[in-house]
Amino acid sequence: MPISSQGTSIDDFLASNKNLFTADFQFPIMILRDSAIEHNIQLMASYCKSLGFELAPHVKTPMAPKIAKRQIDAGAWGLTIANFSQASIMFESGFTRLIIGNEVMEPTSIAEIAKINGSGAGDIIFYIDSLAGLEIAQNSIKKVPNAKLNVLLEIGAEDGRAGIRDLELLKIVLAEIEKDERIYVRGVSGFEGAVPGGGRYGDEVEKIRVFLRQIVAAAKITKPYVRDDKIIISAGGSSYFDYVAEEFAKYDGEAT
């Protein structure tokens, strides 16, 4: 933004129609072509709709509420972000259905999420992948009136960065969550983009598919613990979304 425009609103700045090359902009500058953004938004929305899948675009990189609004207007189910600080920004910008695509370990963040969900003002979901993580969540909301946490059980790959590797452990964590009426299991998730050795060539493809099948298997175990009519089955990146669609389509039941 030009120095002379600092302190103005976004709408006022855009209305001023500053010239990128003659105004007092500070470089370097990244610019986005509006037509390209709109093309990408509509293309992904159309792709997901054609398959019967919902999209919760990850907005951690742009963190631009105006772009996120366009994605929601195009049919996105909600938004994904990386942590609670990002969730706070998007929530304060008017977006109420948010998935934090990570475990949340900070007690103050967990307590705030529980307050928002409990008040009915928002639907903020985050990951749990262990009994230790569950215990942190439970301890964080002890003093929160009407606390409500919405969680996805994260499934992980062997030698991966996070997530439950063992479906027997998944059953144990689910059984513990069921004892706590403040915590709502919404479904399962996993990030296929970080599967060790995964890719688009030869045996790399099967490694991705095996992991996605593990998520589907986990969903079948998790479904009886979900209080909603539909379970959420989610996977992550932008590299293998076609494999995700093919493998998740094999889930036999109602899902989001």
Regions found by a protein language model. Give the residues of each.
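Active-site-proximal beta-alpha core segment in soluble small-molecule metabolic enzymes
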Residues: H58-G198
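Conserved active-site and cofactor/substrate-binding residues in soluble primary-metabolism enzymes
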Residues: L32-S35, H39, P62, S85, ...
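Generic N-terminal amphipathic, Lys/Arg-enriched alpha-helix
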Residues: D12-L32
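Surface-exposed amphipathic alpha-helices with a cationic face
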Residues: I41-K49, A68-I72, Q138-P145, E178, ...
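N-terminal glycine-rich anion-binding loops that anchor highly charged ligand groups
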Residues: F13-N17, A36-M63
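Eukaryotic N-terminal low-complexity, Ser/Thr- and Lys/Arg-rich leader segments
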Residues: M1-S16
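Active-site loop/helix belt of alpha/beta enzymes
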Residues: A157-T256
